[in-house]
């Protein structure tokens, strides 16, 4: 009986341990929320969120593969997007994958307004110089929603 109780306790602690977010998962999730809050306030993406090696990305517009550089500037005439249901998978101490949804309305500077922006996001993050940076991304419209109209960075 004593062994059975010990075995149950070990199994329960294993389940509880696997459900808790790791520090990496917490950091990446908070970074996504903080970067979005910055963009809501400043109508531009925060600088240096992309890896120094750049980021390969498929955008929600359905265009071709894009190569983004760390110094690429993205500005908006209107930005009211919100990240939801963020899940982060820790690959190792310096790599993580984030999956989440983004919804709201957005208008890139010089582009048309999208009042029904609704996409799925998958981003690969790497730890560089003490911070998490985007190394790859795939944005795709969710059924009933619309992606961006942009197909290239100017």
Model regions: which residues?
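Short, low-complexity N-terminal intrinsically disordered segments enriched in polar/charged residues
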Residues: 2, 15-49, 148-154
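Sec-dependent N-terminal signal peptides
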Residues: 4-14
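Hydrophobic pocket/interface hotspot
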Residues: 35, 45-48, 54-55, 98, ...
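Short solvent-exposed beta->alpha transition segments
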Residues: 47-82
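Solvent-exposed loop/turn segments at secondary-structure junctions
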Residues: 55, 63-64, 103-106, 140-143
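Surface-exposed, charged secondary-structure patches
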Residues: 69-113
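A short acidic/glycine-rich loop-to-helix N-cap element
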Residues: 110-115, 144-150
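Short beta-strand edge/turn micro-motifs at domain boundaries
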Residues: 118-147
């Amino acid at each position: 009986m004593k062994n059975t109780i010990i075995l149950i306790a070990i199994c329960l602690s294993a389940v509880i341990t696997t459900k808790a977010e790791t520090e990496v998962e917490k950091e990446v999730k908070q970074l996504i929320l903080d970067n979005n809050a910055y963009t809501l306030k400043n109508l531009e993406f925060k600088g240096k969120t992309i890896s120094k090696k750049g980021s390969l990305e498929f955008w929600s517009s359905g265009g071709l593969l894009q190569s983004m550089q760390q110094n690429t500037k993205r500005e908006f005439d209107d930005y009211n997007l919100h990240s939801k249901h963020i899940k982060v998978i820790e690959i190792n101490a310096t790599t993580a994958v984030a999956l989440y949804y983004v919804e709201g309305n957005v208008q890139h500077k010089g582009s048309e307004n999208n009042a029904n922006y609704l996409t799925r996001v998958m981003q690969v993050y790497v730890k560089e110089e003490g911070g998490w940076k985007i190394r790859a991304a795939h944005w795709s419209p969710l059924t009933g929603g619309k992606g961006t109209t942009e197909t290239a960075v100017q």
